[in-house]
Design a protein with these regions (language model features):
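Membrane-embedded helix-loop-helix hairpins and adjacent transmembrane boundary segments
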Residues: 1-379
C-alpha cells in the first residue's frame, strides 16, 4: 500500500510539472490563450484530452457496474461514438471554425440572437454544476476511496472518506484549470491518457484474466468466453427492460444522444476549438472515434469478468457503482500500480476542468472587460 500510494503521488506531481513546462510560454492574459490554449493544440493532444473527458470517472465506474449487472449489452451506450465523432470531424468542426467561435453558445448567437446565447449559457452552467459535476466527483471519490482504503483510515466512516476524496479531487482539478487554463488541462489529459492506457486498457484486463484463470491468461480468456455466454450477448430484444438495452434504442436513442454530446457539448468542443488549425481538430476527432471502437474492452469487459469470477449478480440498484473499484482494488494492490490508480483521478480532473461554460455569462455581464485568466472554473 505504501508503494502504491507513493507511486500515485509521484505520478501526480510529475504530470503537474510536465504540464507546467509545456504551458509556461502560453499567453494566458487573453481570451484565446486562457480558454482555448492559445489555439495551439495538436491533434494528438486533442485526442488525449477528448478521450480523458469522455472516459470520466462516472463512465469508468458506471459502465463496469452495468457490465457486471447486465453483461456486454452495456457496450450499446458506446456503439454510436465513432459515427458521431466522424460527423463532428466532417461537418460540425468545419462550421464552427468558419464562424471563428470559442464556445457553443456563441454559435447560437450567430444563428439566433444574443438573448438565446445568454439563456443557453446559464442553462449549461447550472446543468453542469447541478447534474454533471456531483456525479464526476462522487464516482471518482468512490474509485479512489476503495482502491486506497480511505474508509479504514477514517475509522470506518465511509461518508467522511467519500467527502474528503470529493474535496481533494475538486481542489486538484481547480488548480489545473485556474492556474493553467485549457492548455494545461489538455496537456495533463494527454499524459493521463498514456497512464490510463497502461492501467485500464492493458494492465487491469490482463491481471483480471490471470486472476480468472488462476495464473494462466489463456485459461482466463477461455473461461471468460465459455462460462457465461448470456452475459456476453450484446444484442437484446426490442422489449428488453433495464438494465438491458433494447436494440432499437442504440440507433434511435443513443445515436441522437451521441451527436448531441460529441458535437455540441462545451466540455468536448472546447478542446477541439483550441486546435491550431482545422486539420489538427479533425485529426484529434477521428483518432478519438477510432479509439472508441475499442472502448467496450476496458469499459465493460472488466465488469463481466468480475461477474464470472464471483458468479452472482447483485440487485440492479444496490451499490452497482462499487463493482469496478472493488474488482480493481486487489489487482492494483497486488501489482503495486499506484500510477494506474492515477488514471481514475485523472479522468475526474478532465471532466472538472472545463472553463468555457462560464465564459459566455461572464462576457454577457461584463462585455467591455476582456478576461485576463479570471479564475472562475466550474467547480
Amino acid at each position: 500500500m505504501v508503494f502504491t500510494l507513493g507511486s500515485f503521488v509521484l505520478v501526480t506531481v510529475a504530470v503537474a510539472f510536465v504540464s507546467w513546462l509545456k504551458t509556461k510560454g502560453t499567453d494566458e492574459t487573453s481570451k484565446d490563450g486562457y480558454f482555448l490554449g492559445g489555439r495551439s493544440l495538436s491533434g494528438l493532444v486533442i485526442f488525449g484530452s477528448l478521450m480523458m473527458t469522455n472516459l470520466s470517472a462516472e463512465q469508468l465506474v458506471g459502465r463496469n457496474g452495468q457490465g457486471y449487472a447486465a453483461g456486454m449489452t452495456a457496450m450499446g451506450w458506446e456503439t454510436m461514438c465513432p459515427i458521431a465523432l466522424t460527423l463532428m470531424a466532417l461537418f460540425f468542426i468545419q462550421k464552427y471554425f468558419k464562424l471563428g467561435i470559442s464556445t457553443i453558445p456563441e454559435f447560437l448567437e450567430s444563428r439566433f440572437d444574443r438573448a438565446t446565447r445568454v439563456i443557453v449559457s446559464f442553462i449549461f452552467l447550472v446543468a453542469y454544476i447541478v447534474t454533471m459535476l456531483p456525479l464526476v466527483l462522487y464516482a471518482g471519490s468512490v474509485a479512489m476511496e476503495r482502491i486506497f482504503g480511505i474508509t479504514a483510515l477514517m475509522g470506518g466512516n465511509c461518508f467522511m472518506a467519500t467527502t474528503v476524496m470529493c474535496v481533494a479531487l475538486g481542489i486538484i482539478g481547480g488548480i489545473y484549470a485556474i492556474f493553467g487554463g485549457l492548455k494545461a488541462v489538455a496537456v495533463s489529459d494527454s499524459l493521463n491518457g498514456i497512464i490510463f492506457i497502461i492501467g485500464a486498457v492493458i494492465l487491469i484486463p490482463v491481471l483480471a484474466f490471470i486472476a480468472l484463470g488462476d495464473g494462466s491468461i489463456a485459461e482466463g480468456i477461455r473461461i471468460f468466453a465459455t462460462s457465461s455466454p448470456e452475459h456476453l450477448n450484446a444484442i437484446q430484444p426490442a422489449d428488453a427492460q433495464p438494465p438491458y438495452i433494447p436494440w432499437p434504442m442504440i440507433v434511435l436513442g443513443c445515436g441522437i444522444n451521441h451527436i448531441s454530446y460529441w458535437c455540441t457539448n462545451q466540455s468536448i468542443m472546447q478542446r477541439v476549438l483550441g486546435a491550431k488549425n482545422l486539420k489538427e481538430a479533425q485529426k484529434g476527432s477521428l483518432l478519438t472515434g477510432l479509439t472508441c471502437v475499442f472502448c467496450p474492452i476496458f469499459l465493460v469487459a472488466p465488469g463481466v469478468i468480475q461477474f464470472i469470477y464471483y458468479r452472482t449478480v447483485p440487485a440492479v440498484s444496490a451499490g452497482r457503482h462499487q463493482h469496478l473499484p472493488q474488482s480493481d482494488v486487489g489487482l492494483l494492490r497486488r501489482s503495486g500500480s499506484g500510477h494506474c490508480c492515477y488514471g481514475y483521478s485523472g479522468s475526474a480532473h478532465a471532466e472538472l476542468c472545463t472553463e468555457g461554460c462560464h465564459h459566455c455569462p461572464y462576457r454577457m455581464l461584463w462585455p467591455d472587460d476582456e478576461p485576463s485568466a479570471v479564475p472562475l472554473p466550474v467547480l
